[in-house]
Each structure stands twice: as C-alpha cells, then as structure tokens.
A protein has these predicted regions:
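N-terminal capping segment at the start of a domain
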Residues: 1-34, 174
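Generic non-transmembrane alpha-helical segments
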Residues: 9, 13-16, 20, 43, ...
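A non-catalytic alpha/beta surface segment that caps or lines the substrate-entry region
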Residues: 22-68
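Short acidic, glycine/proline-rich loop/turn micro-motifs
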Residues: 28, 89-91, 232-235
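Short, conserved glycine- and acidic-residue-centered signature motifs
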Residues: 37, 91-97, 237-241
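Short, hydrophobic/amphipathic alpha-helical packing segments
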Residues: 41, 98, 102-105, 242-250
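Active-site metal-coordination/substrate-binding segment of hydrolases
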Residues: 45-49, 54, 64-167, 222
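Midchain, well-structured core segments that form catalytic/ion-binding scaffolds
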Residues: 127, 131-286
C-alpha cells in the first residue's frame, strides 16, 4: 500500500471528525457529554469496527477498540488520544492520535499481522477539562481515580454536574469504577499528537519524539476581601480582592521564568464576586 493512500485516509477521517463542533468555522468546540462528543464517539467506533477491532464504550465514555494478540495475558500496547476539545480549539488536537491508532490497527489487519500482545486503540473522554474544570476524566477512570462522589462534586458553569451530564449522555455514573483497568494490564502507551507549541514549526521540523512529558498541576485560588461602593470608598479603606489577586497573578509568570527549567505557568480564568462595575470585589477567583 502506498503511503499516500494511508495519509489520505487519515486526513479524510480527520476532516470528517472536525465537523463535530459546536462552533463551525470558529475552531473546534467539542465538550464532553454533549451532542458533538457523542457524534465523534460514534464515528470513532465505526472506524474501529472497520479496522477489525472489538469495540466498546466504557463507563467513563472512553471509546476502546481491541485487537487480540497471540498472548492476551501480556500487558497490552495501547495507543490513542482524546476526542474532546477546548472551546474554539484546534481542529485536530486529540483526534489525530485516536485516528492514527486506528490506522495502525487497520494496517496490522490488512497485512495479516497478529501482534504478540493485545493492541488497544483508545479515544479518551474529557481529557481537556474545559467543561468541568477537572481534566483527564476518562484516563483517570481507567486508573481507578474517579468515583461517584467525584462525578457529583464537579459542575460546569450552568450548574450541571459530571454525574448528571453522564446520565444525559447515556452513561451510568454509578458504574464509573467499572472503567478501571487492572494494575499492570497496560504495558506501553503511545500517542501521536499535533504540536501545540511553536517550536517545531519555527524550526521547520516535521516531527519530534518526546523524551519527557509535562506534569500538570491545577489550582483554584480564592482571594477574600470586602464589598464596598466603588465610587465612595477611599483607597486606604478598601479590602479589594481584585487588587490583592492581581498582585499575586503578576508574580506567577515571574516565578516560572526564574526557574528557567522549562516550567510554564498560566492564569487562564479570573472571576470576581459580585461582579459589578461599581462594586469593590469581595472575592476574586483565579
């Protein structure tokens, strides 16, 4: 088979998947447990079936396709990525890795190759954390790090919990722990991914091999102050939560630069309470 045929099929699959967005023409918005996510999941299932995989969707919404190996008892080789996105995100973020994993399985099938151990293609649900502010939901469930209490705790900006969103999506959150894989059952994991930074593009390099991976920590900080009238409260009598928060925020990027070891930092969300233009904020979250 010519490489052009393979890359052409991958491109065709990606072009099809990118249509499942809530913001056509303005980047990809495919939040977890939505209509767009369901459409993408079903399309991935169809591709996996065509590639000869045994297909299922687990209790966390992960789409999983298995090619049985000569010795299924061995820890599997897993390959894939996520199928959700941020708001107005890149068209191929995540789905490139899922589609490439399925193509690997297809090539094994077409060439009559049976792997030594199971090969598993996966599309993870809610890696980004855009809707509920958490992230790694599907992969976390596979590791046994998600339970019913977790699903009830986290909510989106409309007050919908992961628990209720899963029920609307057709999943049973009471069975979330069923998504856990036995310890040691995954031997290797591979992910093909778009470059999300500017380095390879700026250096005109087509591909890079990752030798380490980013460890992400997320925090929600709440600064407490006191609400006052913005027009009549003197500056020296204010307890302005925003004033205090911005002083901290301005230092965060400086701390990352001072480390000079590749550490990065981002404050991507700021919210004030009560949020009025003429009211000194009593709370500021970032």
């Amino acid at each position: 088979m010519e490489i052009e045929e393979v890359t052409g099929r991958i491109a065709e699959n990606l072009e099809h998947l990118k249509r499942y967005t809530a913001t056509p023409g303005d980047g990809c918005t495919r939040l977890p447990f939505t209509k767009e996510a369901r459409e993408a999941a079903e399309y991935l299932k169809s591709l996996m079936t065509e590639a000869g995989l045994e297909v299922r969707e687990d209790a966390a919404g992960n789409v999983i396709g298995v090619m049985k190996g000569e010795d299924p008892a061995l820890p599997c080789v897993m390959m894939g990525s996520h199928y959700d996105s941020v708001v107005n995100g890149g068209d191929f973020d995540g789905i490139a890795g899922a589609v490439c994993a399925i193509e690997v399985a297809r090539q094994l099938k077409e060439k009559g190759v049976t792997p030594k151990r199971n090969f598993v293609a996966v599309g993870f649900c809610d890696e980004e954390g855009m809707r509920f502010g958490t992230g790694y939901f599907g992969s976390g469930a596979m590791l046994g790090n998600r339970d019913v209490e977790y699903c009830k705790k986290f909510k989106d900006t409309d007050g919908v919990s992961i628990y209720d969103a899963m029920k609307s999506y057709g999943l049973d959150p009471e069975k979330i722990t069923d998504a856990k894989w036995p310890e040691g059952s995954i031997g290797h994991f591979l992910e093909a991914h778009i470059e999300q930074g500017p380095v390879l593009d700026a250096e005109n390099i087509e591909i890079g091999l990752v030798d380490c991976i980013v460890g992400i920590q997320r925090y929600m900080v709440t600064v407490h102050g006191r609400a006052d009238h913005a027009g009549t409260t003197p500056m020296d009598m204010r307890l302005d939560a925003v004033d205090a928060a911005t002083k901290v925020i301005s230092k965060i990027a400086d701390w990352a630069r001072e480390k000079a070891d590749g550490t990065v930092s981002t404050v991507g969300y700021i919210n004030t309470v009560p949020g009025g233009m003429n009211i000194v904020a009593e709370e500021c979250q970032f």
